């Protein structure tokens, strides 16, 4: 009976939430760069990609008190956050004739730079191997 009550409460909460509607990119770099500029910013050994899902990591809040105040600073995570992306599809730069076209003609979502090499995860309790994709705007 308790299980049914909890499930009903969760279902009612989910139905009461507002509709997300149109999803806008977290990192809106598609309007800033042409295809060639974006590929140059990604660099060698990476692939320009269009990604569905963003996990923004690295946002920190600094507290200016305590014994170890500022000892690590932003060494563990950056102050602005880095976008780690998944659900990515490769954008073919070489096959496109209009290299000077803006990225938004090819990608309406989040533009990222993904590793070319395959990720390998072995020897752990839980192994997950996914290619690392970082948002184009996260790259300096």
Swiss-Prot record:
Q: How does it assemble?
A: Self-assembles to form functional amyloid fibrils called rodlets. Self-assembly into fibrillar rodlets occurs spontaneously at hydrophobic:hydrophilic interfaces and the rodlets further associate laterally to form amphipathic monolayers.
SMART domains the record matches: HYDRO
Q: Where is the signal peptide?
A: 1-16
> What is expression of this protein induced or repressed by?
Highly expressed in biofilm conditions and during infection in a mice invasive aspergillosis model.
Its family? Belongs to the fungal hydrophobin family.
Could you tell me where this protein is found in the cell?
A: Secreted; Spore wall
* Carbohydrate-modified residues: 117
Q: Which UniProt keywords apply?
A: Disulfide bond, Glycoprotein, Secreted, Signal
Q: Name the cystine pairs.
A: 42-113, 50-107, 51-88, 114-133
Q: Does the keyword Secreted apply?
A: yes
Task: Name the chain's protein.
Answer: Class I hydrophobin B
Q: What domain of life does the UniProt record list for this protein's source?
A: Eukaryota
InterPro entries with a match to the protein in the record:
Hydrophobin
Please explain the role this protein plays, according to its UniProt record. Aerial growth, conidiation, and dispersal of filamentous fungi in the environment rely upon a capability of their secreting small amphipathic proteins called hydrophobins (HPBs) with low sequence identity. Class I can self-assemble into an outermost layer of rodlet bundles on aerial cell surfaces, conferring cellular hydrophobicity that supports fungal growth, development and dispersal; whereas Class II form highly ordered films at water-air interfaces through intermolecular interactions but contribute nothing to the rodlet structure.
| GO CC, alphabetical | extracellular region; fungal-type cell wall
